[in-house]
Structure formats: C-alpha cells, structure tokens
Amino acid sequence: MNNNKEVPQNSVAVSSSSSAPITVISPQQDANNFIKKRRTALRNRIYAIVRHKQKQHQIFLDKKNQQQQQRVDDATQRALLEKQDQQCIAATRMIEEELLKSSRSFEEYFDLRTFDARVRTILQQLGTMLSQRRAAAAAMNNGEAQCITSTRAVHTSISVSNSFQCGRSLVPINCTTATAGAFSIGPDMQTHHSTGANHQMVEVNRPNMNQITCGISSPLITGFNGNCVPVSANIPMTSQDLFNATHFSTLPQPFLQPPPDQSHMHRYSMSNVASFGQSNPYPCGVVMSSGSMAVAQNSIPWNNPNPMQGLDPTVTSYHSNLQPMQQTPLPKRQLHHPLWNTNFQSAPNNRDNLPQVSQQLSNHGSRQHRGQHSQNLYPGQLQNQDRLLPNLTQQAMALAAPVMHVPSKQVNEDCGQTSSNTVLRWIPFMFHARHCKAKKDKCASKFCFQARKIVKHIDCCKVPNCKYRYCLGTRMWLDHFKQCKSISCRTCVAVREYMEKNKYTIVPLRRAKCSSASSKCQPKKSSKSRQAYKKGGAEAPSVDADLQRSIKRPKLHRPSQNITPETKSISVTGCGVVCKPHSLMNMQEKDGLQSLKVEAMPMDIDVPGASEIPVTRELVKHVAEDTPKGNNCGGFAMVEKTSCLLAQGKSKCMNEMSAPKEENVKQSVEVVDASKMEISSLVELFTPEQVKEHIRSLRQWVGQSKTKAEKNKAMGCSMSVNSCQLCAVEWLVFEPVPIYCSPCGIRIKKNALHYSIAVGESRHYVCAPCYNEAREKLVFLDGTSIPKTRLQKKKNDEQVPEGWVQCDKCEAWQHIICALFNSRRNHGESTKYTCPSCYIQEVEQRERRPLPLSAVPGATSLPVTSLSKHLEERLFKKLKEERQERARLQGKTYEEVPGAESLTVRVVASVDKVLEVKERFLELFREENYPSEFPYKSKAIFLFQKIENVEVCLFGMFVQEFGTDSGPPNERRVYLSYLDSVKYFRPTFRTVSGEALRTFVYHEILIGYLDYCKKRGFTSCYIWACPPLKGDDYILYCHPEIQKTPKTDKLREWYLAMLRKASKEDVVVECTNLYNHFFVQSGECRANVTAARLPYFDGDYWPSAAEDLLRQMNQEDDGETKLHRKGLTKKVISKRALKAVGQLDLSLNASKDRLMMQKLGETICPMKEDFIMVHLQHCCKHCTTLMVSGNRWVCNHCKNFQICDKCYEVEQNRINIERHPINQKEKHALFPVAIKDVPTKIEDKDNNLESEFFHNRQAFLNLCQGNNYQYETLRRAKHSSMMILYHLHNPTAPAFATVCTICQQEVENSQGWHCEVCPGYDVCSACYSKDSINHSHKLTSRSSSTDSTVVQQNGQASQSYQVKLEKLKKLLVHAATCRSTQCQYQGCRKSKMLFRHCIDCTTGDCPICKGLWSLLKLHARNCRDSKCTVPKCSGLRAISRRKQQQADKRRRAAVMEMMRERAAEATRTG
C-alpha cells in the first residue's frame, strides 16, 4: 500500500501493517542526534548551577526571616518552592540562549573548560532581565498587550552568518526575530517558514490573555533568543510562540468562560513551564490551536525536565502547502512523553553528577546513533520515513525530542532529580484512570479513555523492557511511589499532599473488589465530602490501597503487536509521519460521523448541572419512563435517543478501528452455534423489553425492608458516574458469613471479638468467654488441644463488597449481580461481556439476536426423575384445579384469572449414604443385635420459578429415605430433615381457601412427596418443626428482610395444616408425635418403652441428646461436675439415681436404657408437639408396628383401633378380661381387612445423582456462603440461582474461587500465579507484578497450569458422568485390596501407581493429588465398611462425623435457646 497517498486535510497518518517498523537514519540525522545529546547535557549542567545559586540565596532569605521572626506556613512554602522551580527553568533557558548568541563556533559553544565561567557571567546579568519580565507581566495584567489581531500568514526567514566548519550542521533555531551574533549554519539548512492563518487562535478583545489555556496565571513575554518582546497586534504568533511567552502557574486556574473549541487542557497533563518540549505529541513539533494556527516545522524545542509540559490535545498536523484548514474539531491524540518511554530525562540538581555527564559525552565521540530519535516519538511506529519525509522535516524531527538515557534504578533512587510537577499530575491521573467507570467521552478528563488502556496494560505487564507506550516509565514511578517512605523525597511528598488537598475535586476513585475476603466497608463521608460528591467531586482514596490491582473484571490488553487496528494507511502532506493509530477513534472521525459537537472541560471545574449528564443514555431513558418516580428519576437527562454507540455507522467504524485483524470478521448471528459460544451473562438471552423489565426490577429492591428500599431508590435518583449503570447504586456489601464458636456452638455476634485458627481443612472459631475459661492455656478443638497463643484475635466486622464487570464495548461498569454475569466463565480476554445498554443497541440495530434459551442450561435442563415428574404433574394438576375454582367464584374465565406459571421441580441430588450409630448408644444395645449402621438415600428437591426471565430457586428440602435394607427401627421410614424457602413466589394473591398461593404450592409439593413415598412402600415420615434462630439459615443463604422467621408454634401449625390436607386425600393415615408414640404406653399399647425402638436419623435431636446422657451416666463420681460450657452445671447420674427408679441390678444395660429414656423424655416432653410423626400406613395399637402385609384387624365400634396379624394371634390367647376393649365387660369383635398395594421391597427407579455440594444441606450452604450466593434481595436471588444451576450443570467445575495468598482477594479464572510445590499458594497478577513476593519456589501462570479445570461448554454435563463416577469408586476399592502384581482388572495398575504417587508426593496439592482426594471423599461419604482398606477412608469419615457433631450441637443449642425464650415469655405473660 502506498503510504504517500493524498488524503483530505486534517487526516491522521496511520500504519496499515502490524509488522515491526523499519527506520532508516541519514548521516545528517546522526549528526543532529549527537548535537542533541550534548545540548541536553549542557542544559542539565546549567540547571544545576542555577539551582545551586538559588539555594544559596534561599538560605540567606531563611536566615533573614528567622531574624525578623517571620513564620511561613506550609502552603506558602510549597508555593515558594514551585515558583523557584519555574524561575530556575526560565533562567536556564535564557542562559542557553545567551550562550548560543555569544558563541562563534561549535567548539566554543561546547567548551566545558570555560563553560562554568560563561554561565556565571550571564547570571550576573539576570537581574536586569528579570526586572524586564516583571514589567512586561504587569503590563499584560493591566491590559496593555491583551489584544491580538488575526493576521494572514507572513514569510519570515532566519538570517544567520559567521559559519563554522566542523563537519556537522546545526539546525537553525526558530525565532520570531533574527538572531545576531550567532554562529553560522550551513546555507543548505536555511529554510523559510510560514505561519498559518491566526484567526480563532485568540478572539479579538479577549478580556484576559490568560484565559486561552487553563493554568496561565502570569504572561511571560519572551522569545527564544531571550529578548523581551511584547505581544502586539500586528505580530503573528504561533502556538509555540504563545506558550513560550506564557508562564504557567503551579495549580490550574478554572476557566471563567471556556470557549467550546479551546478548552481541552487537562489538569493532570497541564504544563508548569513556559515552553513546549519533547512532550509534544506531534513528531514535527507542530503545536496549533483548534483553528488553523501553524508553526515552523524545524524549530528546536526546549527539552525541559518537566515531561508533561506543553501537552495540548487541540493540535493538528502541519500542512506544508499552507492551504486553509477546515474549521472542524481536532483529532484526539494519545498522550506522549518521554516519562512513559523506557528512558527518562533527568535534570541533575547536584553538581557532582556533572563530571559523569561530561564523561559520557566525551566517550560518545563521533559514534553513530541510529534510531535514537524514533524512540522518543512513537516507539515502533516510524516506518520508511526516509521515503516519506523531506530532508528538512527529518532534521526537524531529529531535534524534536532529545533524550538522555538514565537507568531506571536512578529514577527510583533519585526521584528528586525528575520533575515533581509531572508526577504530581501523572500519578493521581493514573489512580483516576484505574477506577473510572465513566463511559467513553463522558469522563471529565479527555484523556481518560487512553489512560485506562495504559493502566490495563500495566496491570498485567511483566516485560522488563516493554515497548508499550508509557508502560515502563509509569510502572517505575508507581513502584517507587508505593515503596517510598522518605520525607525528603520531594516528588512523593508533593504528590501525597496534592492528592490530599484535591481529594474532593479528583474524579472519584472507588475500590471495587469482588468477593474479597478482607475488604473493608467504605467509610462514611463527612458533610463536606457528601457536598463535594454531589458536585462531581470524590473521596480521597488511600494511595497504598489504590496501588493494589482492582479485581473488577479487568480486560487485559494483548501485546502491542496484536493491537494494531485494521484500517487504511493515511498520510498527511507536509508532515508525512506514519504512526500506528490509536484504538480510540479520534475526535475528528467521530464528529464526522455524528455531527456532534464535543465540549471538554478541565476536570477541576464544577460543571453546572452535573447530575443531569445522561450516563446510561437510551437504556436509562426507556427505564426512567416506566419508573414511578418520574422521568428524571435516577439522575438522567431526557435527551434525544442516544446510546453507548451513538449511531450504527459509528459502531461499524469503531469495530474497524479497534478490533484486531483476527477478530474483524463479522459472522452472521444465524449461523453461530449457540452451544459453542462462551456466554458470560444471562442477559444475552433476553429481548430488549425483557432487559428493561430486569433493570426496572433491580431498582425496586425487592426483598429489602421499606426503609432500605427507599434509601437505595433515593441514591438512584442522585446517580453519579461511579454508580452501577443498572441498579444506580454505587456501594453494596454482602451480608457477613455467620461464624460459630466451636466449643460451645453459639453464634459469634457482629463486631464481637473472637479467636480463629485453621486446623486441617477446617477453620475453627472460639468466642471470648470460651477462650478466657480455657484452662492451662489450651483450647480443645476438634478433639485436639491447641495452645491459646496460636489463635489469632479478630473482630467479626468483615465486609465484602459486590464485584464489578466492565462492558467490552462501551467500557461501562456494572455490578456482577446486576449484570447476571457468571464470573466462573470469566477467562480474561477470551470472555466477552456486553452490557444491557449495548446489547439493546445491537438488537435494535439488528446486529445480533437474543440467543436461544437452550444456550444456557437452566432448571428445565436438569435430569428428570420419576420423583420430580410425579411432583410436577401433581402440582400442575392442583394449580389448575385451584385456578378453575377461583375463576368460577369470580365469574371469570380460566384465562382471565392469574395463576402460577413457569414452575420447575427437580431432584438435584440423590446419594446413597450410611448413618453410623454413635459409640455409646451402640454399646448399650450391642447384646440385642442393634444395627451398627443404617444405609439410606439422601435427596435434595428444589423448586424453581422463572421470575423476570430468570429461573430463581424458591424452595428446597432435604429428605432421608430408609428403605427395606436398613432394618428396624429405621425400616421403611422417611425423615424430612430440612426445609427452606424464600418469599419471592409470583403471583402473591391468595387462593380460594384464604392461604397464600406460595403456601399452597409448597404444601402440594410436600403432599406429593408423601404420596410418592407411600406408593413406594414407606410407612412413616418424621418431621422436626424447628425454625432456625434469627440470622441463621438452613438451605438458602440469607433470607429477605420482608420474610419473617416463624416461631415454633407457627411453623408447627404450617406443617399440621399440610398434613390435614393430606389426610383428606388419604395420603396420611394418622398424625402423632414422637413422645406419645414411643415414651408412654397409652391405651392398649403393649410395646416396651426402650430407646431401641426410636427411629435413628441423621441430624435428629434425640440421638445426640441420648449420647450426652450416656456419657454422663458412665461417670463414676456421685458429686457434681462442671461442664466446660458457659459455666453451666449438671448433676451426674449416679448409682443412687439408678436405685431410685427401681433398677436394683446396676450392671444391666436395661437399667441404663430405662433411666436414659426417663431423662430423655423429660427433655423432649416440653416440646413434644414439635416432633411430628406421620403414619402413611396403619399402625398396630398393641406393638406400634406399621403394617405393610397380611391383614389388619379392625374394630367396627372403635374408630382408630387395629392390630396386626401377629398381635391378633396373641389377642386370641389372652384371657377375656385382657382382650379389647380393656376394662369393659363387653368385648368387641375384630374383622380382617386385607392390606394391598404396599410393595414388599422398596426400590428406587431413579439413578443416583452424585453431587459434591448437594448431598447434604451443610455442603450446599457452605457453597452459598463461600461464594456469597445470597437471597436477601431478588436481584441477588436471580444471580445466586443462576450460579447454582451452573454448578449443577458443571459438576467438575471449581466450586470456590481461588484467593490470593498476599492480598486475600479473589483470583480470576486463568489469571494469577500458582506454586506447584506449596499447597494453596496462589498470587494474583497485581501482587505478582509488584516484585515484592518472597517465595522460595517458582510460580507458574494459572492460565497455562495443568490443573485448570476445563468447564464443559454451555454447562452441559456429560450424561455418562454418574456412570464413570461409579466405575471409579469400584476401581478405587479394588485397587486398595488387590495384592496381585499381574492383575487384569482394568485400571488397577494405574490406581496403584496413583496411590504411590500420593504417598511420595511432597506437595499434597498437585493436580494428581487433588483428583485422588476428591475420589476418596466420594468413597468415604458412602463407605459402609468399618475396616475399609482404602487409604484415608477412616480419617475422612471421622472428619465428617466431627463436622456433623458440630452441626448437631449448634442445632441443639438453638433449640435450648428457643426453649429458654419460650419459658421467659410464659413467665412474663403469666
């Protein structure tokens, strides 16, 4: 492609190739490079001398002030230092100009022997020149030189004489007046310069000259030659001359009336020096106004130590033919300066450094310096410039940005030698760019968009000599600023003072850490802070904290060679510089597409009506129209229809400018296979109307109390750029995870002190009372004594903020929860996220279509079992009947009355388990052949409803099914262990019977389950009506505030109402309670009262209580013993107690059984109604056996009397007085009724559904707590349900996020670093990039690590997963018992090798060990062999038992707490 192709004016030269640039340097440029470096060294030496003189003068003034007892405050002192810096820079420039004028040859100018003397001579004349400048400045302020008339361009030539012959030529100095006495430059280097039209540079009769540019406080009228030349109306001035004649103040001054096309200066990039140096982003040194001001292209810029001087984004390219330039807004260019290059320029302020500089120059000699200048402009972007640039232009560019190579170490060690004014603005600006979430062109900073790209690159860059623009320099400065604690470092001290001083005016810097385990709550703003916040200000962030990488989802940049936009190469006549274009489209191109006038203002200006800036544009416009509070609710201005990409044409152009070549292929939506797409957000399945409905719901805050909801709605009405673009709220914190004291089981309250320690895989907590009561400085945790000194003292005040996600298109930020973003699918650059606003735009412009619902598997995609099918069919049938009845009573048709829709019932887990009988209880009944274990099947049943197009989990219950293989007393029994729900069911009206529709649905699910169990052959169901304590959760984590926790009597009545319905449908035969059925002999019951008849369930109340009683009974002393629990005391059951109950033979276990039943009955009796026993089959009134076969003998006179065949035979052999009914003379006859339809053996038609986190409720609750899957609001319930379904469809995916070992922040998928030796040692990219990791082993990138789990596409779990799992468990058992060296069992040899690896592995956390541990846990969960030979099986089962004991202890403690509250309430009412 021809790079010299003519294009219209104001175009930008770009490169069409992504290959490395080829730069050809001419000998003339080599000579100029050598001259540049020597002149740079001389300037530094001049600056050092001037600075030394100024310090001596300042010492004199300080002594004078001390004698006069004058005190100078800090602000005045800082202003004085800044003023001195400006004076030194101005004096250095003047001295160099005088040296140029007085030198007659090249050798004389660079003669170091007489250099110091010449400088001191010139310094003696400095007083007069400064007086002239003060006079000129005073005249300017008085309005004497404020009017600049627009004149046409004139040709000004530079006449020089007195040539010298040294083999090199010096490029002429561009001045507005001819220089006299200067040494000659070759005639071939003389050139004519022309200035363009000067109109629009400064308006005629402008009131104040210093309003042209932000930050001009006092004009400094001086040319490059040092002469004092006042600005007159008939002298054409260029931008270079204007800024050379202008003195910049230290802090920017606000515009009084900023012109719309000249207010592009940025406070962070504002110069403090009165000239343009090599920081000019335009290679030719061209600096122009937004109109058409041009300047000579071969001027020698002043290479000031301040790298950010002269940064003017309103410049445009130079046009050599001087044609009139179009009056269009100028392109926005990226910041460029040597500060961000690999090499820094430093101005030494110590004269001891001058010999080193001189030695470097002398060693340089006449060596060639090829390619030096290209690094100073746009590294890697100049291509074939020998063919593109005229000779004069090349020579001018060669002098445009001289550089002095200084090692990076010197920058860190001697930060005072660099420009403090530059860093004073650059570091705060980097902090702003790191956290700014404003959309493109909406941030007050015009360069924010480019700076954000720099920050994103820096966050992940580890290349020592990175050539990415501004990367290395910024990294060095940030590392130094983070580590520097010296109060003598002027730069760092000034930056911190500047940030503290401007903390209310800097654009808000907000931390956004997702799923952070150690994040703190945002401090409350003061009244001043809140007032500044309303005006668009910000809170002051912690500098050290902000240096931490934010774990909002960062979209990491590819290497520089991969970010070349796909665009045509365009060149500009006259300039000819070929540059790699920005990923950001320049302002000129955008204006051409949109015809939109963009007005940028300095960031420190209070923009009027800032709250009316349309932040989310079209999307929020549509949402706000439907918001009850009015059209302006949410702080958005109702403007014309706009969006993140304002026009379809712009969208197309943006894609062409920013998309890499390999991504610039537009594919049709119709041909994309949804199953192969990486979908990160559920919003991609919505239609635009559904998206708007979702956002409206977010801002209603369903689930919160009325007070909190109104507060959040009010915050949404004052939405700022830092707020989430969906919910309109900025700072949201998760509910803290509840923690419990391991010794006593009591929940540790918020903000309470406690002690913590990690033991094995578990973390234990100890409350302050238990810690203080621990004897011998030891605490017993999990059967292990731990010294108290090892426990860490903590406060239960940890808060975790919600995470953020950034749109890849408009770069707006939203909460992960609001966006329904799946962070588990976030694989960095490969995962694309489109915000709802851009999504609506694309759908409405037909650029994409909503994905099919099958693209993201939901609840309906879960496996259908016979149980779930039975429950769904029954539920839908009952709902239809209820709806028909309601329509009949209301006189409407079936379709006219609302009903519950989109309901899905699924069995999410069905696992075989074994319940081991506790040791002491088993020992008590060993002689009676009591079973040592009870096999059962644990099932988890969940109800989902699609609410606002998201399937939300509303109801869940865990059940235990003991079949015919369990044996008595658990044979054919079902235990409803846990049940939970959240109050989001739709609709919310009541049924015909008066109950809520959600209650009706939940009751029907329970009745349907009992009906299913009865048909399978189960005889009874047991329910413990025990509500959780306030703040605790059973299944679903964090309930909404609008849902009250029911008291025990309310919950019991809820169950009994359900059972009454079931009785009417003949599902339930009889209801009683555990105490009346087993602890007392009522009526004609002839069964023994023994604990051996009690059904033994996992997690039930009485098994653990009985074990505690037996432990007390085994104690030998007669006195009292204090339990190590809260100072409570209980009496020991002694021999005297056994004699008191009539048990004379103390050695018999029956005596202990009888005494234990008595004590246990005393405990249960006050709450006996809570232990509900449901009979699904008829119960024999004599032996209390539930009859399943044969006949039941019924009495026609007595309604509820029936006995089994066995008891009937015994009844016939009794004497007449003992027959039914007892104590009555007239005896009743019994008639047989055949028992039918009860299966002889209980078999489950459904296959097992293994699940690591759904096999019991504690594992599921741990999953929700560890990932903050909360349900206290509908917005969080949607996201939590989405993630739960993700885990169900991806059983092999990691369940918990990886946490950084250093900062305790979440490490994203495929990000960060991992140690292959140390288990659990992971480091995020931010901590890794700080080079402060003291780890002895090599860290491996997690993106390339072999232990990264590959998630199945679209969450579709393999159908053979369960089958493979069963085969692996069988293989594990075989390999553990096999002793043959020639075993032919498939996989046996590999399994043995796997065992040997785990034994020899020193890491214990390698991928192989992790896989084996997962398999061992699955085996131990269901293992029934007490002498199992599988490695670690017994240990894993012991750990599981201890965890279950802790859970049981907490539940019993909660029951006792409720009993005490109930007793206290009864005392108060009585």
Curated annotation (Swiss-Prot):
CBP/p300-type HAT domain segment(s): 856-1293
Composition bias type Basic residues, residue spans: 522-533
Ranges of Polar residues composition bias in the record: 1-10, 342-365
Positions bound to acetyl-CoA: L979, D980, S981, R998, T999, W1054
Positions annotated as zinc finger (TAZ-type): 416-495, 1358-1436
PHD-type zinc finger locations on the chain: 764-841
Subcellular location: Nucleus
Cellular component GO terms held in the UniProt record: histone acetyltransferase complex; nucleus; transcription regulator complex
Keywords: Activator, Acyltransferase, Chromatin regulator, Metal-binding, Nucleus, Repeat, Transcription, Transcription regulation, Transferase, Zinc, Zinc-finger
Keyword Transcription: yes
A molecular function GO annotation: zinc ion binding
Entry-linked InterPro entries: CBP_P300_HAT, Histone_AcTrfase_Rtt109/CBP, TAZ_dom_sf, Zinc_finger_PHD-type_CS, Znf_FYVE_PHD, Znf_PHD-finger, Znf_RING/FYVE/PHD, Znf_TAZ
Binding site for Zn(2+) 1: C1180, C1183, C1204, C1207
Binding site for Zn(2+) 3: C1300, C1303, C1324, C1327
Residues given in the record as Zn(2+) 4 binding sites: C1315, C1318, H1335, H1337
Name of the protein this chain belongs to: Histone acetyltransferase HAC4
Natural source organism: Arabidopsis thaliana (Mouse-ear cress)
